[in-house]
């Protein structure tokens, strides 16, 4: 059996059950483990709800239980500059961002990783549901977590080969109930703690109210694609492509009881387009353009790839053909896709392996750009 005691692993601990069990498993495997609590958002701000103080108490309790040193590190400035400013800029541009993807890329596997290296870390570890496989030549492949319902490779798709080489995902081979059971068997204080939901800096707070504190709302007209005025919208930033709720219109218009969905935006005219039917023509597209395209392993500057893709978290894979040129890609769908949303991540897979991904700029229907921004 290899001697892990000379290998230092710094664990990102959130105060939740997943990162608690991550630290526990590594400690049981004999590694030299240090726990780090990342404070990314100012919880004294009256506009944001964050349970950082309580979460840190949970980290302290677990670290004491399993016998590892721990520190709290403040990454609020890095988070604001690298994640939150991006989040606001995307909403200003009429897009729907995915801050979790950027948080992993810029904070958990950059700012945190850099800090861990100053502590003499050989690796960092997190409670993400993903796996890494290492080739003999040192190349690392990122694989889906075995728990399909919890697999988080979608959010990790922007990680680089260098970041992955320094990363461990001890929970990747486990399913969530198994993780909770391990926590209970070890008597960890976080064993029954509920999973966090929503974006970390908003917590359980009303998203609309939160966003309006940073971006002034600009109400405008809500219209059908054929020009019927359907009333007023509260501000384009509050709506995402394919959204059903919150429109304030029922099936009464024109006598058709089919539900209404957001089918488009016109940022220049401040118009929100709506249509009836889950598979409304305006929601369907046949290809997309992506930027900030990145692969977890070294790839040629220009190439074509047949693979599968996800366009949102927990969505079944879809067959695609990807034409890559630099950090941009055209992604052609084998079957038309619904509600491809600018700002969201498109993530590429080859079987179990997550190859990387990019950010969706535009969706196209038979060569014509969809009016999604």
Curated annotation (Swiss-Prot):
It holds the Pfam family tRNA_Me_trans_C. GO terms for cellular component: cytoplasm. The active site is at residues 103, 200. The record marks 128, 344 as: Interaction with tRNA. It is an enzyme of class 2 (transferase). Signal peptide: none annotated. Residues 98-100 are annotated as: Interaction with target base in tRNA. It comes from the Bacteria. The keyword tRNA-binding applies. GO terms for biological process: tRNA wobble position uridine thiolation. InterPro entries: MnmA-like, MnmA-like_C, MnmA-like_central, MnmA-like_central_sf, Rossmann-like_a/b/a_fold. It catalyses: S-sulfanyl-L-cysteinyl-[protein] + uridine(34) in tRNA + AH2 + ATP = 2-thiouridine(34) in tRNA + L-cysteinyl-[protein] + A + AMP + diphosphate + H(+). Residues 150-152, 312-313 are annotated as: Interaction with tRNA. The keyword Nucleotide-binding applies. Keywords: ATP-binding, Cytoplasm, Disulfide bond, Nucleotide-binding, RNA-binding, Transferase, tRNA processing, tRNA-binding. It is found in: Cytoplasm. Its EC number is 2.8.1.13. PANTHER family: MITOCHONDRIAL TRNA-SPECIFIC 2-THIOURIDYLASE 1, TRNA 5-METHYLAMINOMETHYL-2-THIOURIDYLATE -METHYLTRANSFERASE. Belongs to the MnmA/TRMU family. NCBIfam families: PRK00143.1, trmU. Catalyzes the 2-thiolation of uridine at the wobble position (U34) of tRNA, leading to the formation of s(2)U34. This is tRNA-specific 2-thiouridylase MnmA.
